Amino acid sequence: MKANFSLATISKNITSSLHVGFVNISSNESTFNCSHKPSDKHLDAIPVLYYIIFGVGFLVNTIVVTLFCCQKGPKKVSSIYIFNLAVADLLLLATLPLWATYYSHRYDWIFGPVMCKVFGSFLTLNMFASIFFITCMSVDRYQSVIYPFLSQRRNPWQASYIVPLVWCMACLSSLPTFYFRDVRTIEYLGVNACIMAFPPEKYAQWSAGIALMKNILGFIIPLIFIATCYFGIRKHLLKTNSYGKNRITRDQVLKMAAAVVLAFIICWLPFHVLTFLDALAWMGVINSCEVIAVIDLALPFAILLGFTNSCINPFLYCFVGNRFQQKLRRVFRVPITWLQGKRENGSCGKSSSFREMETFVS
């Protein structure tokens, strides 16, 4: 499929969308020439790494979904969020084999325009859904530790309102991808690329706008909520006098809180920094071929790092808990009741905050 896109516009778009070099880039504000064809040797390892992430992530998230579906009785609010997070991560990871093939063919999309649009939108939708559910879980954990009495009144029906809202927000965030994603022929590279086919006359504006939207909705706002909640938990727990088992539980919670924040930052910060630099390039603020080359080289690996977040989420939110381990051994029904009774009967000196803390790490 051919289109009236300039070589400059298309070549830069592949880097922005899924990701080859910038060639003869121009915008309304600036014009500069990076005429060499970029090396793609660094892409050789990407497909293999994608398949590794797909295999590991699909396995661990399938375990989470299976255990949730097999669980009898009412579901906890936190469990509902974990389940939806695992579903979003599974759907995101399911697209990786296609993108691995895309990389192995050096950005030559062989699956047709419909699959390009569908799987491009699918990837964006579930990326946002995963990040939004991580944010919801952070708020839920903050409430359970800071306001334990109020949090005990939480019912699954409350999550039944929040979960559809989160999925709707993710769908709305992915609408530009669904509308613009298409296959375009790039004669310079000899490929049919799956790209964001913005109107040529407004290409720079659209590209910069979408990049900034990803930064704000996909990183800045969620990070504010996540960091605020977990730093609030840390501040609250450090004020609480704790001894013996309470102290061990508190330290576990603090470590988990730090791990969640650090994992989110490590996995997504590189991608969003490069996305922001890309937006600056479209706006004409950056016009250095050297900087463009760095973005071109680093973007595939930054995206790869972002996908690893879907692999480690089950470990951060589920696998470390005692209750998950009990479920995995298929003996959780009686032991959980006994354990809860033991906690209440054998810990008269515990505050409600520390009982909620034990739920946090269980």
UniProtKB/Swiss-Prot annotation:
Keywords: Cell membrane, Disulfide bond, G-protein coupled receptor, Glycoprotein, Membrane, Receptor, Transducer, Transmembrane, Transmembrane helix
Region (Helix VIII): 323-332
Glycosylation sites: 4, 13, 24, 28, 33
SUPFAM superfamilies cross-referenced by the UniProt entry: Family A G protein-coupled receptor-like
One GO-annotated biological process of the protein: calcium-mediated signaling
InterPro entries (UniProt xref): ATII_AT2_rcpt, ATII_rcpt, CCR1-9-like, GPCR_Rhodpsn, GPCR_Rhodpsn_7TM
Keyword field contains Disulfide bond: yes
Protein name in the entry: Type-2 angiotensin II receptor
